[in-house]
């Protein structure tokens, strides 16, 4: 008896030559709808699904393959006589190959004009049912969900007349990953649609983007995955124009740099090392912004990652070229700028759209045995409940500097202190176990620039000692959440030294 293949694909890439090759191996093709028409137009003999089921396609094609004549042929275990007897009794032929991919749900919901009804209509029912049935019975059925695997199947058929058991098992595992990811995407879409914030089970899916040379350290293996429908203004969806492959640490640092530069509407440049900003600058032009970021810390920027929120022009490119950098991220590069920067063969150049709204995504952090999920910290200065508890209010110039410090400090590892003037950071104290320690580092880094600068803190001052330290350094204004039981101590110290202090009511811990 001829072997039989059920072929029903939304992605028709390579299906005609694959089906032709199956026919050459004495395989009968059974097909549905558009796939059947495409194969017939190519001159391939095809049996219609209705001829197998004895039942027409109904409900606008919603019911085609959901039939015992199909699923019996897929699930029968060929080594069991009672299964074969039941197939014979009901005139059901075994199906040996299933070549199916699913309705384009992901592509549909990615379209801006897609409606909820469009999404629902592109939820495949029959396809996953056939794939899962075939994958469950992979000892007897070869199941193919990805056109990439056509060549492997045909090679094994040509070499040995059948598909190896190990290959069938690998293809079955791929099917279950595929259908799980498909269902996860649907679940995520519908969960978002009904506004469910903390569902009883979390279904997310990621697609492999690339293998990485290694992880955080050379002895650790690592892979880069991306969300199929993640924000376009993200490192996962960035376009690499030049340079060697991104490393695990590059990706983390680039993501951190991008998060900070998104805070600014004016021309801004951000330099990052080990996921902390070492310099942030703003200006009238992107060249001025980068010059300020460089001036903020000309030592730590060496080997760093730069993110800019305007096109890189040739003058900025010439300045960037003179510094050893790992990555430059920007919305675009002028042709002249590319000519300058691509002369450095290892420098990675990434582009992505930065004119999008700053889309908040859930942050998922894995822990041993589980995961933590939280909203992204997108709380802006405009939403803060500003209070000024000191006698002196900030001047206009201090307000600008305070806003810059506050935007940056929430992206610094806690405990965090940032010193800034109106256009740049001048000192960053990151990742310290106590706030005074972070302040000391920021002040030491700022040097003479500390005098006349302002201070931003990611959390409240537990005691008044940080204000005393700020006063000694010549810092004129402070922005912090407030809320300590000893706030009065900090306020009194600020008043004593003529420092203006702003409470935001918002903490920005980052771990």
From Swiss-Prot:
One Pfam family this sequence matches: AICARFT_IMPCHas
Annotated coiled-coil segments of the chain: none
Keyword line: Hydrolase, Multifunctional enzyme, Purine biosynthesis, Transferase
GO CC terms of this entry: cytosol
E.C. number: 2.1.2.3, 3.5.4.10
Claim: Transferase is one of the keywords in the record: yes
Domain MGS-like, first and last residues per copy: 1-145
Gene Ontology molecular function, alphabetical: IMP cyclohydrolase activity; phosphoribosylaminoimidazolecarboxamide formyltransferase activity
Keyword Hydrolase carried by entry: yes
Reaction(s) the record says it catalyses: (6R)-10-formyltetrahydrofolate + 5-amino-1-(5-phospho-beta-D-ribosyl)imidazole-4-carboxamide = 5-formamido-1-(5-phospho-D-ribosyl)imidazole-4-carboxamide + (6S)-5,6,7,8-tetrahydrofolate; IMP + H2O = 5-formamido-1-(5-phospho-D-ribosyl)imidazole-4-carboxamide
Pathway: Purine metabolism; IMP biosynthesis via de novo pathway; 5-formamido-1-(5-phospho-D-ribosyl)imidazole-4-carboxamide from 5-amino-1-(5-phospho-D-ribosyl)imidazole-4-carboxamide (10-formyl THF route): step 1/1; Purine metabolism; IMP biosynthesis via de novo pathway; IMP from 5-formamido-1-(5-phospho-D-ribosyl)imidazole-4-carboxamide: step 1/1
NCBIfam families: PRK00881.1 (NF002049), purH (TIGR00355)
Domains (record comment): The IMP cyclohydrolase activity resides in the N-terminal region.
Name the record gives this protein: Bifunctional purine biosynthesis protein PurH
Lineage: Bacteria, Bacillati, Bacillota, Bacilli, Bacillales
Designated gene of the protein: purH
